[in-house]
Amino acid sequence: MKKVVATGTFDIIHPGHVRFLEEAKKLGDYLVVIVAREKNVKHKPKPIMPEEQRRRVVEALKPVDEAILGDEEDIFKPIEKIKPDVIALGYDQHFDEEWLREELRKRGIKAEVVRIRAKEDCELCSSAKIIERIVTLASSRLKDFQERKEKL
């Protein structure tokens, strides 16, 4: 059985996440997703959803066979335990592939590292874009509400 690992924050699930996981699943037979711990998310704002809730949502997705929380101290511990054949990276993940390959080699992990390409036809395939859209719409609606209230 060929095991694939995919990792990510998966804060607000969107079509880009689903596509990434579908493509990762195609690389093997069994897909394990490592969901980032809040403590380890440093390259973007703190997640909106609690980590266990993010894990449960990811595990409910069709391509995912298993979803686990990452290790707070050593991001490689779950990978050492899983012993994947492939590690799938999203197009926007902040991992240098060569650095990752070297770290895996140092730990005796013989996994292929594959970067999944972005799909260009998705308007809201970014948690940041979704949050921005919500804030913009909420601000507009709040302004409309306040204007109507003043007319009463």
UniProtKB/Swiss-Prot annotation:
CC cofactor: a divalent metal cation
Pfam families per UniProt: CTP_transf_like (PF01467)
GO annotation, biological process: FAD biosynthetic process; FMN metabolic process
Catalytic activity: FMN + ATP + H(+) = FAD + diphosphate
UniProt entry keywords in alphabetical sequence: ATP-binding, FAD, Flavoprotein, FMN, Nucleotide-binding, Nucleotidyltransferase, Transferase
Entries under InterPro entries matching the protein: Archaeal_FAD_synthase (IPR050385), Cyt_trans-like (IPR004821), FAD_synth_RibL (IPR024902), Rossmann-like_a/b/a_fold (IPR014729)
Enzyme nomenclature, EC number: 2.7.7.2
The name this protein goes by in its record: FAD synthase
Source species of the chain: Ferroglobus placidus (strain DSM 10642 / AEDII12DO)
